[in-house]
């Protein structure tokens, strides 16, 4: 198929011309911050395992998305010696309105990085590793090869360890996607993040239909592989828009869906439109499961890699 030009099938739903003024008005500038509800309070990052993992990452010159993206689950995950390693440096070539990862001109790709990531995975004794990266629009094929190399290195240095890769869109480059899929990760994850109407503000440089076609193409290349995607809520979307995204993802064969609350990293990032309650997350999960996903992880603090190993096992068991 001509994957890179096959967006027209769903493009009629991508309402890019709608005004985004509501998004910037959803939180008054002078409004005092409300107390954080109990369901958004996470474990503080302390303890021996936390400090051991931090030292290991520093000693191998590695980055984790847990730190760079200010993940609220870092305390819980690092306590259990699980982390999401972020490759291709620590500078992203895009400026998404929700993301805390630093932006700028990245250094040349470090092709020794996969070996060091695998060394860390082996040292931690992980049974399941999650690997992601910044966007590297300056070198799409090189970025894809890094993912393939890290899968190969983990299987060499840590036999039996499963691998989930959370990949960027590679600007719809079929060769780049095939390089990653051919490496056969246990789970291939690519996040849609939000509803089409909000893409211009939330996901600078990305396209909703491109993300859907990436997931579709990955499933066509490897029908037996597990694919996954995630969305944030609380950015100004409507429930009906979320359900449309769920249906689109189910329609391209996506197996696992994660749904979590958007939390503003700083005043320089997009404001929060509203906080969803645990009950609302349960309702979203119920609706998504009815659409055919093998597994749905839905909750205020859910992020792409949260409970990733358990998600993969549950999705595989449901086949």
Language-model features: locations:
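Local cysteine-cluster metal-coordination motifs and their immediate loop/turn environment
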Residues: 65-77, 88-103
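Short, surface-exposed acidic/glycine-rich loop or hinge patches that mediate macromolecular interfaces
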Residues: 90, 168-171, 236, 301
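Short connector loops/turns at beta-strand edges and beta->alpha or beta->beta junctions
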Residues: 90-93, 126, 193-195, 262-264
């Amino acid at each position: 198929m001509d994957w890179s030009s096959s967006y027209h099938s769903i493009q009629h739903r991508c309402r890019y011309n709608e005004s985004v003024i509501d998004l910037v008005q959803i939180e008054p500038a002078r409004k005092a911050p409300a107390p954080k509800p109990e369901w958004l309070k996470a474990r503080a990052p302390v303890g021996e395992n936390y400090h051991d993992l931090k030292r290991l990452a520093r000693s191998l010159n590695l980055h984790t998305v847990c730190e760079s993206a200010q993940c609220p689950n870092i305390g819980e995950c690092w306590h259990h010696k699980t982390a999401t390693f972020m490759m291709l440096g620590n500078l992203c070539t895009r400026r998404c309105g929700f993301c805390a990862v630093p932006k700028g001109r990245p250094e040349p790709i470090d092709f020794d990085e996969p070996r060091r990531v695998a060394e860390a995975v082996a040292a931690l004794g992980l049974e399941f590793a999650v690997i992601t990266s910044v966007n590297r629009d300056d070198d799409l094929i090189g970025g894809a090869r890094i993912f393939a190399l890290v899968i190969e290195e983990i299987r060499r240095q840590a036999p039996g360890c499963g691998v989930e890769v959370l990949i960027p869109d590679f600007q719809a480059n079929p060769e780049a996607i095939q390089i990653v899929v051919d490496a056969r990760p246990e789970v291939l994850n690519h996040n849609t993040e939000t509803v089409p109407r909000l893409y211009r503000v939330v996901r600078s440089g990305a396209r909703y239909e491109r993300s859907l076609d990436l997931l579709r193409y990955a499933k066509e290349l490897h029908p037996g592989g597990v694919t996954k995607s995630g969305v944030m809520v609380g950015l100004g979307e409507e429930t009906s828009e979320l359900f449309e995204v769920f249906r689109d993802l189910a329609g391209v064969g996506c197996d696992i869906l994660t749904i979590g609350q958007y939390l503003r990293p700083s005043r320089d990032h997009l404001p929060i439109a509203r906080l969803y309650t645990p009950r609302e997350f349960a309702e979203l999960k119920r609706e998504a499961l009815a659409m055919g996903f093998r597994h749905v992880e839905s909750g205020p603090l859910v992020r792409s890699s949260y409970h990733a190993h358990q998600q993969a096992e549950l999705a595989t068991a449901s086949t």
